[in-house]
Amino acid sequence: LASEKIKDSDGILPVVESMSEISGITSVLLASEFLSSTSGGKGVMLGGVTGVTPTEVVIIGANTAGEHAARAALGLGAIVRVFDNSVHRLRNFQNLMGQRLYTSTFHPQVLSKALKSTDVLIGALAAEDIRPWFYVTEEMVKGMKPGSVIIDLSVDSGGCVETTECRALKDPLYEKHGVIHFSAWNLPSRVPRTASIALSNVFRPLIQDIADAGGITPMMKFNNGLRNGVYLFNGILTNEPLGQKFGILSKDINLLLAAF
């Protein structure tokens, strides 16, 4: 059972949504620290004060993580620019934020120009939106200002910045082409108490429903959301994309449950 694939009654992935909220907000707080001189940054504050030009933040991905990163950055007074490969998501993003923001689809020249002046780049693309090519190339990173910060939240799914590396949690910070990189896989683990409470809010009612149904198998029969998270059932692979990726035969979970 893959908890991140379980859906609620509204068709939302509650585990992913909760962790994305935490990742988005935490990424901005970390970027603020990395910009400080004590962390080897440029010695600037993320945001702005009266009479001082505010810092600029570029966010790649108009999703939940991107939304909460944008809210945190805007709350600090930063200039925020958002890029995504879907006009529909960008439009929804604008509506959710309740204000006009700089948004753009992925035009290499436009993105490259924005990166030359930005102080922080946050990659928030979901795994299913990452393509074999990188949205932010190494050449674009070379053009960024020295001491700028890159936090790629999708590094464990391939990343959307060519220069990001999936590093150990104990050594996540490194510099490349004069730009500070933070390997941000499993970012919620840096705030474990908050993450644990958020996960408990998701799992407690689910576990109660499973108990009331008499077990997980009876629950799966009438709960489509729980069924969506099943990868293996009685030793049989039920996730077709996973089977295609590794060349393993998979079967429809609905057909298997009919026998129980």
Identify the meaning behind each predicted range.
Residues 1-3, 83, 124, 153, ...:
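Generic beta-sheet signal
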Residues 4-30, 34-45, 155, 160-260:
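Adenosine-phosphate binding glycine-rich loop
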Residues 22-26, 64, 68, 84-88, ...:
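Conserved active-site and cofactor/substrate-binding residues in soluble primary-metabolism enzymes
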Residues 97-177:
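Rossmann-like adenosine-cofactor binding region
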